[in-house]
């Protein structure tokens, strides 16, 4: 067997080993995606109601001063950026980081609360201030994770170490479609929405808050922040699993195509080798005549 054929066989073996790995990862990510989607389907309606409720309340408390809804001069802005702890997810990490960078370029001073090793590594390498980092939670986030992140963000805001707080995450649309989003968390303000969105409800003059509007907001706003963060973590986790599944499926398909191409090269080389051997035998027989 010629050196060329041996090399092709080694390459086929190597690519086939890689294919087995990517296929296994595809199956694992498919199982994780199914689990994440079930979690998302259960949590999404609840957090949508929470968002609409707090929006209605804030809209009806115009004129009431509260630290978490009253804007102030912006000297520094913090961004909570949700990424994954690992790669192999196509453009998932790059897209959400790009959305964050595009938005923060408009700010004078910024700091980052990094969720996931990929985001932490990106912003640390480029010299951004890191107010906090959370790892090993991106694949299977819990509500307590959201509470810890929310507590840090609100403390920074209350202590006036930052004057705005944004959340950057990836919304899950479908297995192959994921949409980076940038949402302002603090100071809290009514969401006007885009075209077709419902108009904010008019203030109810007879609405009252016990014991006081400020104390009601003291309780509700932290719950809202935690809910938004948990919803974003679940959306991002589902998007990550979808991106990983698609990436591994594509890698497996590419490996299959490569093996087919190498097998064709091997068959042609083998055919050429056999033809050459036959020609040499015939030539030798002719020489003996």
Swiss-Prot record:
It is a peripheral membrane protein. Belongs to the ATPase gamma chain family. It comes from Alkaliphilus metalliredigens (strain QYMF). GO terms for molecular function: ATP binding; proton-transporting ATP synthase activity, rotational mechanism. This is ATP synthase gamma chain. Gene3D superfamilies: 3.40.1380.10, ATP synthase, gamma subunit, helix hairpin domain (1.10.287.80). The keyword Ion transport applies. Produces ATP from ADP in the presence of a proton gradient across the membrane. The gamma chain is believed to be important in regulating ATPase activity and the flow of protons through the CF(0) complex. The gene is atpG. It is found in: Cell membrane. InterPro entries: ATP_synth_F1_ATPase_gsu, ATP_synth_F1_gsu, ATP_synth_F1_gsu_CS. The keyword 4Fe-4S does not apply. F-type ATPases have 2 components, CF(1) - the catalytic core - and CF(0) - the membrane proton channel. CF(1) has five subunits: alpha(3), beta(3), gamma(1), delta(1), epsilon(1). CF(0) has three main subunits: a, b and c. One of its GO terms (biological process) is proton motive force-driven plasma membrane ATP synthesis. Keywords: ATP synthesis, Cell membrane, CF(1), Hydrogen ion transport, Ion transport, Membrane, Transport. HAMAP family: ATP_synth_gamma_bact. NCBIfam families: ATPsyn_F1gamma. GO terms for cellular component: plasma membrane; proton-transporting ATP synthase complex. Coiled coil: none annotated.
């Amino acid at each position: 067997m010629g050196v060329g054929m041996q090399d092709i066989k080694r390459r086929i073996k190597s690519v086939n080993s890689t294919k087995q790995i990517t296929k296994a990862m595809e199956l694992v990510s498919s199982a994780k995606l199914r689990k994440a989607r079930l979690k998302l389907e259960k949590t999404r309606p609840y957090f949508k109601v929470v968002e609409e409720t707090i929006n209605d309340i804030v809209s009806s408390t115009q004129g009431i001063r509260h630290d978490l809804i009253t804007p102030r001069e912006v000297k520094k802005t913090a961004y909570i950026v949700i990424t994954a702890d690992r790669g192999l997810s196509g453009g998932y990490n790059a897209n959400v980081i790009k959305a964050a960078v595009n938005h923060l370029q408009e700010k004078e001073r910024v700091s980052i609360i990094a969720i996931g090793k990929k985001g932490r590594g990106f912003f640390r390498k480029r010299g951004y201030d890191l107010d906090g980092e959370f790892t090993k939670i991106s694949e299977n986030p819990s509500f307590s994770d959201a509470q810890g992140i929310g507590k840090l963000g609100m403390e920074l805001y209350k202590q006036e170490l930052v004057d705005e707080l944004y959340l950057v995450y990836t919304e899950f649309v479908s297995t192959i479609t994921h949409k980076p989003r940038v949402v302002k968390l603090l100071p809290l303000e009514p969401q006007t929405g885009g075209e077709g969105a419902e108009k904010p409800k008019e203030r109810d003059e007879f609405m009252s808050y016990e014991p006081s509007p400020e104390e009601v907001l003291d309780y509700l706003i932290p719950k809202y922040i935690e809910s938004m963060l948990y919803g974003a973590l679940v959306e991002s986790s589902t998007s990550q699993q979808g991106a990983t599944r698609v990436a591994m499926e594509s890698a497996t398909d590419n490996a299959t195509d490569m093996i087919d191409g190498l097998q064709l090269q091997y068959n042609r080389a083998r055919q050429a080798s056999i033809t050459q051997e036959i020609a040499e035998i015939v030539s030798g027989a002719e020489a003996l005549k």
